[in-house]
């Protein structure tokens, strides 16, 4: 893997991303702080419907600033529908963001409240575009489900992911990751917020319709600590842990956040 020209700290940290990626100062950047008093209920927002085939889970990869679980996305075996969308969006991958301690780590915040971590389940508009990379640059290209994670009880649905981390300890490591349904990690309550935003790390494309569930899921402190035990460095390099990988909330710049609930 090429060396990253951006990071989460120091001279290539988030406050400097705009030097390499001017869109970092754009009008539709993510994450944001959701101010619940300013949110508008939108009766046209339908319930979110996900249908994921566990057989499409493929591999888990350490990408240096994070890890992700990738899915086979050649056809519509795993899709997201409903919500603000007319068509279906194909599942591509999921990943998490976290902080140095359990009292912060989520990227989105709610009335300033931070959660311990945040899950992002990434989908692309396969009805309109022919690949993830093409869709990622288009305003209507991506749909990302965000789920807040609160430190508390251990989450059995998360354990398979946690157990796989030891096999991808260092940057560039991959391991097979089969038979997993990420809908296990979606909260029971269907209440969500939605707005138009961006990827939360470079290239920061403003191509994302966000679906942010109101209800958090839980993970234990032990489970969350395993995220921080991953290394951003390759085997043989001086070890450096991925202690945090979250961007701070960005200005709303006139955007309207909508709620599926009153």
Curated annotation (Swiss-Prot):
Active site per database record: 65
Record: residues binding Zn(2+): 95, 97, 120
A Pfam family assignment: Carb_anhydrase
Molecular functions per Gene Ontology: arylesterase activity; carbonate dehydratase activity; cyanamide hydratase activity; zinc ion binding
Domain Alpha-carbonic anhydrase: 4-261
A GO cellular-component term linked to this record: cytoplasm
Residues reported in the UniProt entry to bind substrate: 200-201
SUPFAM superfamilies: Carbonic anhydrase
Regulation: Inhibited by acetazolamide.
E.C. numbers: 4.2.1.1, 4.2.1.69
The entry's keywords: Acetylation, Cytoplasm, Lyase, Metal-binding, Zinc
Intrachain S-S bonds: none
Names of the cofactor(s): Zn(2+)
InterPro entries to which the protein is assigned, alphabetical: CA_dom, CA_dom_sf, Carbonic_anhydrase_a-class, Carbonic_anhydrase_a-class_CS
Tagged with keyword Disulfide bond: no
Family: Belongs to the alpha-carbonic anhydrase family.
Protein's job: Catalyzes the reversible hydration of carbon dioxide. Can hydrate cyanamide to urea.
Protein name: Carbonic anhydrase 1
Source organism of the structure: Monodelphis domestica (Gray short-tailed opossum)
Underlying gene: CA1
């Amino acid at each position: 893997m090429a060396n990253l020209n951006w990071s989460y700290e120091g001279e290539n940290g988030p406050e400097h991303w705009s030097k390499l990626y001017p869109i970092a100062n754009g009008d539709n950047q993510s994450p944001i702080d959701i101010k619940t008093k300013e949110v508008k209920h939108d009766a046209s927002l339908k319930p979110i419907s996900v249908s994921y085939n566990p057989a499409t889970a493929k591999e888990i990869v350490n990408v240096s600033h994070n890890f992700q679980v990738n899915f086979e996305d050649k056809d519509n075996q795993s899709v997201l529908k409903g919500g603000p969308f007319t068509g279906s969006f194909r599942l591509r991958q999921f990943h998490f963001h976290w902080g140095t301690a359990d009292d912060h780590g989520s990227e989105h915040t709610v009335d300033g409240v931070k959660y311990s971590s945040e899950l992002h389940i990434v989908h692309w508009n396969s009805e309109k575009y022919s690949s993830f990379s093409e869709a990622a640059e288009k305003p209507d290209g991506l749909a990302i489900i965000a789920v807040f994670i609160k430190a508390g009880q251990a989450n059995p649905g998360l354990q398979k992911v946690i157990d796989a981390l030891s096999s991808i300890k260092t940057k560039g490591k991959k391991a097979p990751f089969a038979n997993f349904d990420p809908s296990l990690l979606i909260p029971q309550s269907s209440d969500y917020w939605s707005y138009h935003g961006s990827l939360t790390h470079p290239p920061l494309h403003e191509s994302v319709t966000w679906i942010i569930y109101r209800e958090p899921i839980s993970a234990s402190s032990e489970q969350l600590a395993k995220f921080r035990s991953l290394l951003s460095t390759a085997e043989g390099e001086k070890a450096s842990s991925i202690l945090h990988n979250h961007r701070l909330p960005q200005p709303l710049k006139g955007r309207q956040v909508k709620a599926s609930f009153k």
